[in-house]
UniProtKB/Swiss-Prot annotation:
It comes from Acidothermus cellulolyticus (strain ATCC 43068 / DSM 8971 / 11B). Belongs to the UbiA prenyltransferase family. Protoheme IX farnesyltransferase subfamily. CDD domains: PT_UbiA_Cox10. This is Protoheme IX farnesyltransferase. The keyword Cell membrane applies. InterPro entries: Protohaem_IX_farnesylTrfase, UbiA_prenyltransferase, UbiA_sf. Pfam families: UbiA. Carbon 2 of the heme B porphyrin ring is defined according to the Fischer nomenclature. GO terms for molecular function: protoheme IX farnesyltransferase activity. The keyword Coiled coil does not apply. GO terms for biological process: heme O biosynthetic process. It is a multi-pass membrane protein. The chain crosses the membrane at residues 33-53, 59-79, 106-126, 127-147, 155-175, 181-201, 208-230, 245-265, 285-305. The gene is ctaB. It catalyses: heme b + (2E,6E)-farnesyl diphosphate + H2O = Fe(II)-heme o + diphosphate.
C-alpha cells in the first residue's frame, strides 16, 4: 500500500470540531453525484405528469431521493475506506483523514436510508420507497461489495444503481413504472460506462494501485475506447427511442439527435487519438458526458410543452 499524501494526514483525535464533523458528513454523501442524480428525477416527473406535477410531491421526492443517494454514497465510503487511502483522487475523503470515524459513517449512512424510506413511503408512495431501497442495496451490495473489486464489468452492471432515480420519479407521479421510465433507465445505463471509463482512463494508476479492475486497468486503451464508442451509440439510440414510447415531439428528437451527434463525435475522437498513439484526453468526454445528460434531461422536462 502506498503512503498517504501529506495533505491526507489524519486529524489528531482532539482536533475534530463540530464544523469539521458536519462538513465531513456532508462530504460522505458526495453532493455532486446527488446533484447529477436529481437532474434526472425532476424532468422524469414532469414527463410523467405531462407538465409540472404537485410542488409538494416534487419537493418530497427530491428530498427523499437525495437522502437515499446520500445513504448509498456514505455506505460506499465506509466500505471503500481502505482503497480510498491508496488513491490520490480520494485521499482527502473524511474517513481517510479521520474527520469522521468508521462507526459514525456507518450509523449516518443507515440513518439516512431509514429516513429516506419513511419519507418516500408515507409522503409519496411505497413503490417509490421500495425502488429507493433497491437502489441503495444495488449500489452498496451488488456494486461496492460484490463487483467493484472483482470484475471489469463492475461499472456496467453496478452502474444500474444510478438509473433508479428515473424509475422513482416516474412512480412518484403515476404509482407505477411505465415504459418511458424504462427507456430513460436504458439511456443512463448506457451513459454510465463511457462516463466512468473516461474517468478511469485518467486515473488508471490510482485504480491499479488500489487493485480495482476497472476496464482501463485490465484492457488495452483501444479496447476501452471502442467500448466507450459502442456504449455511446447505445445511449443515443435509447434517447431517440423515447420519442415513440413517450409520445414526445420533433423538438425533443432534434435536441436528442444533436446532443447525440456531439457526444459520438467526441467518442470517435478518443478512438482515433488512441489509434494514433496520442493522449486521448479522456476528461473531455467525462465533462462532456455530464453536460450531455443535463441537457438531454432539460429536453425531457420541456418535451410536454413543445411540439
Amino acid at each position: 500500500m502506498t503512503a498517504l499524501a501529506p495533505s491526507s494526514t489524519p486529524l489528531p483525535a482532539g482536533r475534530r470540531g463540530a464544523v469539521d464533523i458536519v462538513k465531513g458528513l456532508i462530504a460522505l454523501t458526495k453532493p455532486r453525484i446527488i446533484e447529477l442524480l436529481l437532474v434526472t428525477t425532476v424532468p422524469t416527473m414532469m414527463l410523467a405528469a405531462r407538465g409540472w406535477p404537485s410542488s409538494r410531491l416534487v419537493v418530497v421526492t427530491v428530498l427523499a431521493g437525495a437522502l437515499a443517494a446520500g445513504s448509498a454514497n456514505t455506505l460506499n465510503c465506509f466500505i471503500d475506506r481502505d482503497i480510498d487511502q491508496v488513491m490520490r483522487r480520494t485521499a482527502r475523503r473524511p474517513l481517510v483523514r479521520s474527520v469522521i470515524r468508521p462507526a459514525e459513517a456507518l450509523a449516518f449512512g443507515v440513518a439516512l436510508g431509514v429516513v429516506a424510506t419513511l419519507l418516500m413511503g408515507f409522503l409519496v408512495n411505497w413503490l417509490s420507497a421500495i425502488l429507493a431501497d433497491a437502489a441503495i442495496v444495488f449500489y452498496v451490495g451488488v456494486y461496492t461489495i460484490g463487483l467493484k473489486r472483482r470484475t471489469p464489468s463492475n461499472i456496467v452492471i453496478g452502474g444500474a444503481a444510478g438509473c433508479f432515480p428515473v424509475l422513482i420519479g416516474w412512480s412518484a407521479v403515476t404509482g407505477r413504472v411505465g415504459w418511458p421510465a424504462v427507456v430513460l433507465f436504458a439511456v443512463i445505463f448506457a451513459w454510465t460506462p463511457p462516463h466512468f471509463w473516461a474517468l478511469a482512463m485518467r486515473f488508471r494508476e490510482d485504480y491499479a494501485a488500489a487493485h480495482v479492475p476497472m476496464l482501463p486497468v485490465v484492457a488495452e486503451p483501444l479496447v476501452v475506447a471502442r467500448q466507450i464508442l459502442w456504449y455511446s451509440y447505445g445511449m443515443v439510440a435509447a434517447s431517440l427511442a423515447l420519442a415513440p414510447v413517450a409520445h414526445v415531439g420533433w423538438v425533443y428528437v432534434a435536441i436528442a439527435a444533436l446532443l447525440g451527434g456531439w457526444f459520438l463525435a467526441e467518442a470517435h475522437r478518443i478512438v482515433q487519438r488512441v489509434r494514433l498513439g496520442r493522449d486521448p484526453r479522456p476528461m473531455r468526454l467525462f465533462h462532456m458526458s455530464i453536460s450531455y445528460l443535463t441537457l438531454l434531461f432539460v429536453a425531457v422536462a420541456l418535451a410536454p410543452y413543445l411540439p
